[in-house]
């Protein structure tokens, strides 16, 4: 459906008398993307002018298709899959993580950074083909997992953040607190990733996050060789990306509407269970360091549980897409926003 030039040079429209007429489209009304190949960030408005980064050159469509085929075939071979065999879940995860990363060996210096920025539609080049595939996969999974084929947006946050950070008494405390919150954020996102896939998380983008890479390698069993060129594999110093607090304390995900509450409650349980396990391990190590028997000392464990009671707080909200429905279901037009307006009224002080 994509066309580098739109509208077309001619367009057929019905006249007042009902007859179809063919009209010429003037040049100023046409979008000729190849003459000004600029990619625009949908949020910041930042522009990436391809003409200033080597420009555009003719590339055979068949050549791109072949390189794409070889790239994804290579990922399947790395998983040990041949002729349709293998773990489909692993294949999805490998495609999601490494699909946008075309190696120089496979690229032959032709596409370079443009591979990651290829627009989904040159008529509106404000998002890449990978963004399009991420959203398509996320919604397809949510639709398929819901008995009514309905998706919902789930927004979830953990906290409180400021009091937790304010309790720090040194720079190392600040680093440890930020790192712990980032890890808690991942533990909150992990149940969603395990149930629906990491593509279901719309914000933050998880692709390339070192903590997520570790999960893909160690828990989802993607081959270590796929991560050989990742920055977090290159050194063990403090500058390793694994030591960075890379995740915020909130996320937005596309989930099956009927499972939104269940998923949110599962997230809350997972986060508090993980933190409690860490607390028990800390107490055990402290007791061992003090020369006490970790198995026969009850008071420190009880104190730790009391200190962590109710932490972290988990707040969430879910909005089903059914709040907006088309009145014309055949053509999917004439949207009815009454239910959405009613749901949003309290937030805008509307009676």
What residues fall within each predicted segment?
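Regulatory and interdomain segments flanking nucleotide-handling catalytic cores
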Residues: 1-351
């Amino acid at each position: 459906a994509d066309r580098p030039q739109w509208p077309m040079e001619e367009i057929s429209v019905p006249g007042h008398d009902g007859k179809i007429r063919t009209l010429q489209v003037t040049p100023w009304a046409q979008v000729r993307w190849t003459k000004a190949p600029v990619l625009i960030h949908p949020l910041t408005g930042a522009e990436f002018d391809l003409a200033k980064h080597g420009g555009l050159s003719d590339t055979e469509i068949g050549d791109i298709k072949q390189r794409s085929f070889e790239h994804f075939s290579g990922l399947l071979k790395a998983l040990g899959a041949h002729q349709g065999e293998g773990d489909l879940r692993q294949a999805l995860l490998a495609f999601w993580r490494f699909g946008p990363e075309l190696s120089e060996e496979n690229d032959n210096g032709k596409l370079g950074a443009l591979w990651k920025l290829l627009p989904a539609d040159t008529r509106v080049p404000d998002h890449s083909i990978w963004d399009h595939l991420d959203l398509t996969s996320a919604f397809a999974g949510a639709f398929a997992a819901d008995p009514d084929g309905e998706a919902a947006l789930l927004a979830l946050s953990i906290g409180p953040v400021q009091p937790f950070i304010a309790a720090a008494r040194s720079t190392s405390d600040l680093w440890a607190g930020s790192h712990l919150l980032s890890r808690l954020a991942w533990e909150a996102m992990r149940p969603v990733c395990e149930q629906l896939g990491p593509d279901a998380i719309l914000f933050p983008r998880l692709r390339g996050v070192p903590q997520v890479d570790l999960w893909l390698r160690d828990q989802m069993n993607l081959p270590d060789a796929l991560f050989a060129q990742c920055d977090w594999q290159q050194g063990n110093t403090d500058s390793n990306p694994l030591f960075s607090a890379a995740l915020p304390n909130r996320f937005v995900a596309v989930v099956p509407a009927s499972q939104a509450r269940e998923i949110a409650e599962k997230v809350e349980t997972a986060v508090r269970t993980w933190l409690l396990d860490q607390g028990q391990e800390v107490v055990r190590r402290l007791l061992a360091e003090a020369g006490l028997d970790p198995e026969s000392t009850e008071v420190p464990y009880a104190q730790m549980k009391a200190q962590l009671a109710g932490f972290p707080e988990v707040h969430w909200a879910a909005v089903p897409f059914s709040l907006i429905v088309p009145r014309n279901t055949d053509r999917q037009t004439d949207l009815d926003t009454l239910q959405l307006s009613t749901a949003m009224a309290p937030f805008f002080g509307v009676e």
